[in-house]
Amino acid sequence: MADVRKMKETMIIIGSGAAGLSAALEFAKNGTRSILISDMPSERSQSVMAEGGINAAMDTQRDCPELHAEETMKAGRYIADSKAVHQMTEEAPKIIKDLFESGMAFTLNENKKPDVRAFGGQSVKRTFFAASNTGKQLMYVLIDQVRRYEAEGLIERLTGWEFLKLLCDEEQAYGCTLTHKVTQQEKILYGKVVIASGGLNGMFGNATGSVRNTGAVTA
């Protein structure tokens, strides 16, 4: 087994789309180093293809995070984790504000503020968007921020590596094994692991997203 690296204080993030980049940024802001693992560059992730928008209950149409959470749970047939959904809807307005202030090119209303539109499963307009390329604009902002922390050594991106398996004891994961797509070299990384590998498109015969999201990490 080649290149065994012990990084107990380093977070290992599997996936470098919007979720993976966001996780790395949060760790970096707190001074924690992270390594992003992906088999392709962030610029080619599934997140780039997202078109619809980002939901957040801002001060429009008497909306509120509680209503946002209620409608999100209903749209998901109440399968979702209620605590996680409520946390998401509480934090969503700040995320929109931060993205706008970071330069994300949202479609604007007549007051030069991010506009909202209707979307499925919602009784009010709460979807913030960037024309029909919301995902691409979001990734521009996240990648730009990640590069700044890369320069400081707080974020490292390992591209071209595929996840093989978690290393686990009886209670938790303590690392993972990777293989290089071209050379088949194997690498072991030690540290806490975050799974942000995206959806399961490749597991289905028909999917509207990229089949590069094979679902292999989840499987």
Predicted segments — roles?
Residues A2, S16, A131, T183-E186, ...:
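Alpha-helix N-cap/helix-initiation motif
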Residues T10-L36:
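N-terminal Rossmann-like FAD-binding beta1-loop-alpha1 element of flavoenzymes
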Residues D39-Y174, L178-H180, A196, G202:
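Conserved N-terminal/central alpha/beta ligand/cofactor-binding core
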Residues K29-R33, S42, A56, T208-G215:
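A glycine- and small-aliphatic-rich helix-loop capping segment at beta-alpha/alpha-beta transitions
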Residues K6-E9, T183-K192:
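Core beta-strand elements of the Rossmann-like FAD/NAD(P) dinucleotide-binding domain
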Residues A24, I96, V217-T218:
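Generic hydrophobic/aromatic pocket-lining and core-packing "Φ" positions
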Residues K192-A219:
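Glycine-rich loop(s) and the adjacent beta-strand/alpha-helix scaffold that form part
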